[in-house]
């Protein structure tokens, strides 16, 4: 199947478009050459220049704006803008940040105006909820109001931290009852909105946790959760002893390094000069905690701890005789005889005695118990590095001679000795001290901002630039246009005056009168004569006169017109 022929418009070469474009340009040129458009062109240019000048004035006269209150809620922004607009202050919403911005000169007046109206309101006061509590309120409603007031007060207190723009506190308080043996502990959740560009360190998060837990009875610190607007849990690991210990250890190490560095700088700066030293100190610390308990026993040395002694003695006579009345009667009175020996009865009458003794003694062997707790933070190694600015060396007279050292050996030895004394150098510990000399790169120190950084200087420069732009537009554009419109154009060199080059047709003049005037005039004719002719016959007469004066130019013009028409037809 033969392919369909390509349309002629597609096969038209690119060279065929050139005559069409030339024809369009000629049409535009002819449209611009119309007398009415030419007469209206100055007014159009003046209007365009005026519009551009007004636009530049509006853009350049816009003052520098500053943010009034960062981090305001949307409802607060609407109230703030309404209040400022009513007070005559041009407040707008910044397109980049979305914050309320006011002119720099009106900043303090805007804050005073908003403060007088109680804006921004922020969080309500918790006491207002309790003061509006009506009589006869149920216990559940009163408890809910009390919890809400407590949440608002805690949120207001947390918002006072400079890095926190807004805060919300949620309390989960279980109901207390005497009939419950075990109850759930109270818990709290804190949501923080951090100011852009700011962060909360661990100490600030710990302070918020302590603030909330101390404000609620029975709440433990581990029952408080802190979250920021990015969804990050800030209170994670705040109660972990290992985490707290690591933070304290790092802080202690940084403090020691700073102390040693300050010691070295205070000793070496008077020698090398301010800004000619760079000191860094690194300390390796051992935080291992050891408990050594030692017990010693000496068997040769004893000590009497307690002694107990018990002695029992009995002296009662023993019972004798036959039980009965006769045996219990007293014996008869005996007759005493001189010189008679003692009888057996006398011996039997002597009492019986018994004695027992018991003694107990407790001894303790000599013992020595010693408990040693070494220091928790022990410096294991100290490394100090000192860089001294090398002084410029004079030009060497002998190129073959070795260059002199950047730091003299005597001075280097003195600096090293002072550095070792400052850090408490211990070779057995493995301490290292390094001192070298190198040329420093000159850093550009920012100059202090003077009067040129003041806001009024920028405003004055903006106004001056605006006035200069208006002067350039007025003198370079508007003035030439007005001169061209209001003042007659000067005659060209070799041309006749206006009265001799233009044909003015008065009222009541006939064609013969105009023809007679043209014949009498022997000067050059211009296009203004054709524009001044009113009737068709007058225009033909002027064209004939032009043909008589310059036949070659007229023929060339007609030839170009015919060629353009032929190109358009093709």
UniProtKB/Swiss-Prot annotation:
Question: Which residues fall in a coiled-coil region?
Answer: none
First-listed, main subcellular location of the protein, grouped into a coarse class? membrane
One Pfam short name: YscJ_FliF_C
Extract one GO molecular function annotation from the record. cytoskeletal motor activity
Q: Keywords for this entry?
A: Bacterial flagellum, Cell inner membrane, Cell membrane, Membrane, Transmembrane, Transmembrane helix
Q: Where are the transmembrane segments?
A: 40-60, 463-483
The annotated regions of Polar residues compositional bias extend over 354-363
Family named by the database record: Belongs to the FliF family.
Q: What is this protein called?
A: Flagellar M-ring protein
Q: Which organism is it from?
A: Cereibacter sphaeroides
